[in-house]
Regions:
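Fe-S-dependent hydro-lyases/dehydratases of central metabolism
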Residues: 1-325
Length: 328
């Protein structure tokens, strides 16, 4: 049976299924200082250890000083969270990219830069924009603190299988310098709305997506969450494989894996998506956000819509639009 890329990744990581819910194996668990303290406390209370220390990677992320790191951290909560992660990683034997590590960085940046993120893998992190890793052909999703504890203890996660949603961006951009990846994703969210992807995983396809650099693809997948979806992904190609080659954690048999990925990690011809949306890249122009959510976006050539026009009969949206316009 023909399958989508997401369905292939899901099926290859499904451990079991009970009452319609699936137990999914997690290949990579990224941890940072903000959403992990209570999870480690839960392990202590229940006298559990970390199941796969070798597949768990911690980094200082949210509370890192942007200037002199040798100076004390002024915010007391931030300092406590950083010290707590250091303590927890030492106690549970988890590798940590601390403030003095050359590998420390924003979690969704260092994952690919270090070769931790790989095509066809499942990746979780206690951060809503974990979908960024989907740019590399991974099923990556943000999870809450209770699920962080569950993955630390079991290396698995119980999930309802999302629906599949194809976003196809056909054709080429008129000007690759003027029309950015951010313009593409804002155009999409403007059309489908911030709840358009609820209960789905997006797969971005089409010529305009293939033309994007890996950084641009990360921009697209990062903002999938703003469309209400659980995750977004793009099939890996030569750009993906070249980017990840030779990184610190890239597997030694990488070239062999690439040959397998070329054949396996793509949506089959004839595969059916539950939903589909098509947009013409040539029609996309620079976007301007005028409100308080990503759907409140207009072409740079357009006027800001009236609240009633934007809301289309939804009173809550009309109120939101009025608030949004007040900030312009």
């Amino acid at each position: 049976m023909a399958k989508t890329l997401f369905e292939k990744i899901w099926d290859s990581h499904k451990v079991s299924e009970i009452n319609g819910r699936s137990l999914i194996y997690v290949d990579r668990h990224m941890v940072h200082e903000v959403t992990s303290p209570q999870a480690f406390d839960g392990l202590r209370i229940n006298k559990r250890n970390v199941r796969r220390k070798d597949l768990t990677f911690a980094t200082m992320d949210h509370n890192v000083p942007t200037t002199n790191r040798k100076l004390p951290i002024v915010d007391q909560i931030s300092e406590t969270q950083i010290k707590t992660l250091e303590k927890n990683c030492q106690e549970f034997g988890i590798p940590l990219f601390g403030l003095d590590s050359p590998y420390q960085g924003i979690v969704h940046v260092i994952g690919p830069e270090l070769g931790i993120t790989l095509p066809g893998t499942t990746i979780v992190c206690g951060d809503s924009h974990t979908s960024t890793h989907g740019a590399f052909g991974a099923f990556a999703l943000g999870i809450g603190t209770s699920d962080v504890e569950h993955v630390l203890a079991t290396q698995c996660l119980v999930l309802d299988k999302p629906k599949t949603f194809e976003i196809r961006v056909d054709g080429k951009r008129k000007n690759i310098h003027a029309i950015t990846a951010k313009d593409i994703i804002l155009s999409i969210i403007k059309k489908i709305g911030t709840a358009g992807g609820n209960g789905t995983v997006l797969e971005y396809r089409g010529q305009a997506i293939s033309d994007l650099s890996m950084d641009e693809r990360r921009t697209i997948c990062n903002m999938s969450i703003e469309g209400g979806t659980r995750a977004g992904l793009i099939a890996p190609d030569a750009k993906t494989f070249d980017y990840l080659r030779g990184r610190k954690y890239t597997p030694k048999n990488y070239d062999d894996l690439v040959e397998k990925w070329k054949q396996a990690l793509k949506t089959d011809i004839g595969a059916k998506f539950d939903k589909s949306f098509v947009i013409d890249a040539e029609q996309i122009v620079p976007q301007v956000s005028w409100g308080t959510n990503p759907a409140m976006t207009a072409d740079v050539t357009e006027s800001i819509p009236e609240p009633s026009e934007f809301a289309k009969g939804d009173s809550s949206q009309e109120i939101a639009a009025k608030i949004g316009r007040a900030h312009v």
